[in-house]
Structure formats: C-alpha cells, structure tokens
Swiss-Prot record:
Family: Belongs to the TVP38/TMEM64 family.
Record localization: Cell membrane
Keyword entries, A-Z: Cell membrane, Membrane, Transmembrane, Transmembrane helix
Protein's name according to its UniProt entry: TVP38/TMEM64 family membrane protein slr0305
Lineage: Bacteria, Bacillati, Cyanobacteriota, Cyanophyceae, Synechococcales
Origin species: Synechocystis sp. (strain ATCC 27184 / PCC 6803 / Kazusa)
Length: 209
C-alpha cells in the first residue's frame, strides 16, 4: 500500500496547479478508508514544503475525519446502538463526552496513542456535536507540522524513508512529550467526567425508583 501511495504522490507532484486539490481529495479518501496517513503527511513535506504541506494535510485530514464521523453517526450508529442497548455505563460516558466533547477531542488529537482513523468513527457514535468535533481537529496541528517538516527533509519522494533520521531531535522529543502529556490528561479527564456522569445517572435512577 505504501508503494501505491508514493506513486500517487509522484502523480500529484506533476499536476501543477491541481496538485493541492488532488492531494487533499486523496487524503480525505485515505482517512475514510483507513489508509496510512503518515506516508501522505510526510510526502506533503516533499511535494509542497512545510507551510503549504501542513495546510493541505490539515484540510484533507479534517475533511476526511468529518466524513468518517458522519458515516459513524448516521450509518453505523443504529447498529452500535443495538449492541449497547441497556448499557448504562456507555450511556453515561456518551452523555459526558457530549458535555465536554471539545476538550476531549482536542486532547485525543494531540495524543499519538489514539488511532486517528478509528477514532473518527468512534466519535460518530457519541453525543459530541459536529461543531465541537471539527473545532477539536485543531489538536492535530502540532503533530501535522512535525511530520510534514520531517518529510520535507527527505528532499525527494524516493528518499522519504530516510527523513526521520534527519529530523531535529529536540522537535521530535517536544512533540512526544506534548503527546504523552495529552495522553495522560485525556485519560484522567475522561475517567473523571465518566465517573461523575455515572454517579449522576445512578442518583437519577434511584430517585426515579
């Protein structure tokens, strides 16, 4: 699959003024169908440079993530709802995410632990609003810039794999530390609001009884 994506990047590189649009469309589709976005992100650095590459990756990733979110919400939600019917814990967590969705989306976008493509569909079956979900995509910016920058160091698509060895170690460690902090933060935060939501759900059910 990596070879196909590299060939696609080579083709895009020769499109001239249409290259940006073709790249963003490819990235959008890749996000929806679970293709490895890392290759495209690194390749953007070679084809477009750091600034434009980062912009095009962000737009393509956001469009793809939004499309996957909508598919998860309107096409897969019914099936998932049947699977978790009667599960009070999921309902409580779902409601909690709906209340604090923006913060959670931003933190999970900053963290490298959460799989990007799968997470897009997972958010679709929660109560997080589309607005908060899209705004939360801003959390992708630091990682996007880093990987596009690393890709730009390769100089050509043929040597793309060697770019990671040339990257500034300080930059790499900075992004890793930010990602680690975000991972810890989102874990603690989700646990906290989930526990609060569960307690509220339990109290409500007791009052109803």
């Amino acid at each position: 699959m990596a070879d196909y994506l590299l060939n696609a990047l080579q083709w895009i590189d020769g499109l001239g003024t249409w290259a940006a649009i073709a790249f963003m469309l490819l990235y959008t589709v890749a996000t929806v169908v679970f293709l490895p976005g890392s290759i495209l992100t690194l390749g953007a650095g070679v084809v477009f440079g750091v600034i434009l590459g980062s912009i095009y990756v962000f737009i393509g990733a956001t469009l793809g993530a939004t499309a996957a979110f909508l598919v998860g919400r309107y096409l897969a939600r019914g099936w998932v709802a049947k699977k978790i019917a009667g599960n009070q814990k999921f309902k409580a967590i779902d409601e909690a995410v709906g209340k604090e969705g923006l913060k959670i989306v931003i933190l999970t976008r900053l963290s490298p632990v959460f799989p990007f493509n799968l997470l897009n569909y997972a958010y679709g079956i929660t109560n997080v609003s589309l607005k908060d979900y899209v705004i939360g995509s801003l959390g992708m910016i630091p990682g996007t810039i880093m990987y596009v920058y690393i890709g730009s160091l390769a100089g050509s698509l043929a040597t793309l794999g060697t770019a990671t060895n040339q990257a500034n170690p300080t930059l790499q460690w900075t992004i890793r530390i930010v990602g680690f902090i975000a991972t810890v933060a989102v874990t603690i935060y989700v646990t906290k609001i989930a526990r609060k939501a569960l307690n509220e759900a339990i109290l409500t059910s007791e009052v109803d009884e």
